[in-house]
A protein has these predicted regions:
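Conserved beta-strand scaffold positions in the cores of enzyme catalytic domains, especially
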Residues: 44-46, 82-84, 106, 197-200, ...
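Short amphipathic alpha-helical segments and helix-helix/interface helices
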Residues: 30-34, 68-69, 95-99, 186-187, ...
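Conserved beta-strand termini and adjacent loop/short-helix elements that scaffold enzyme active sites
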Residues: 9, 47-49, 109, 200-204
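Catalytic core and acceptor-binding pocket of nucleotide-sugar-dependent glycosyltransferases
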Residues: 66, 137-249
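GT-A fold catalytic core of metal-dependent nucleotide-sugar glycosyltransferases
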Residues: 60-122, 146, 151-152
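Short catalytic/ligand-binding loop motif for oxyanion handling, primarily in non-cytosolic enzymes
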Residues: 15-16, 53-55, 91-94, 99-100, ...
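Short, flexible, basic/aromatic active-site loop/helix in glycosyltransferases
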Residues: 122-136
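N-terminal anchoring/stem segment of glycosyltransferases
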Residues: 1-80, 256, 261-263
Length: 263
């Protein structure tokens, strides 16, 4: 019987400890996704060892995108849908099963967090993709996406694209464009290959930059319920945009507050 898969990405690049302030938060975010799998009878696949050891030539963000099918198939899993989940994501203990909302399409969430960054990234990669006119309104974030076997060929060809042009991509991401790794190339590849991407799932399933949206606050005017907005109204909490050296501390504090719900 086919099962849905949570492909959780938790590779520790020790060379970036100073930049990211350690990876202690992995254990807390991972626990929420294991709980999800137990609730909804899904396979939990932990991608914690890179297939390519050179993390400069093969960034973690690239490896998660181009090797998801390879890793899952190597485990002999009879998979249905796959949710690729970054380690910065935490799922609420009683939130719904998003796999039931996909219509078996490729699912992503539109990225509006930094439109200038997105525009510059799109323009920077445009010459590589033969000046393809990418529809910016359908640009998605690659940190949480859902796909299935119907998208295997597209994702495997994306892997070939990178492996055949990795020196060019490294130059673009590290020297010329300096706006992301896999995300913008993946958006180009999905649109070039006419992949039908479902982008209308509620934002509750992907709350990003929560501090900028005041989601860590609560309704102080009523002063009845001090539950932060992101817990009350969100399902999938993404801890990005926070100073990276503070991320583990913030997530640990949250985990200590809510962990009893996952027992």
């Amino acid at each position: 019987m086919k099962r849905n898969v949570i492909f959780w990405v938790g590779i520790k690049n020790e060379n970036h400890n100073d930049k990211y302030g350690d990876f202690k938060y992995f254990e807390y975010t991972k626990a929420t996704w294991k709980h999800f799998c137990k609730r909804f009878d899904c396979e939990f696949v932990e991608f914690n060892e890179p297939l390519q050891k050179d993390l400069t030539e093969y960034r973690v963000n690239w490896q998660k995108a181009i090797y998801a099918f390879d890793v899952i198939e190597s485990l002999g899993i009879d998979y249905d849908q796959i949710a690729l989940v970054d380690s910065t994501c935490m799922y609420k203990w009683d939130a719904p099963n998003f796999f039931e909302l996909t219509d078996h399409k490729f699912v992503g969430w539109r990225d509006f967090d930094n439109m200038n960054w997105i525009y510059q990234s799109i323009q920077g990669y445009k010459p590589f993709f033969n000046d393809f006119k990418l529809n910016m309104t359908n640009y998605i974030n690659s940190g949480f996406i859902i796909f299935n076997e119907a998208h295997r060929e597209t994702m495997q060809s994306f892997k070939e694209l990178y492996e055949n042009n990795k020196q060019v991509f490294m130059q673009l991401q590290d020297v010329i464009v300096k706006k992301g790794n896999d995300q913008t190339p993946l958006n180009y590849w999905l649109q070039i290959n006419n992949v039908d991407v479902k982008t209308d799932l509620p934002m509750a399933y992907k709350l990003t930059h929560m501090h900028r949206r005041d989601l860590f606050k609560y309704n102080w005017q009523l002063n009845v319920d001090q539950t932060p907005y992101f817990i009350k109204y969100g399902y999938n909490w993404i801890f990005n945009g926070i100073p990276k050296h503070e991320r583990s501390q913030v997530i640990e504090q949250l985990w200590n507050f809510i962990k009893h719900n996952y027992e």
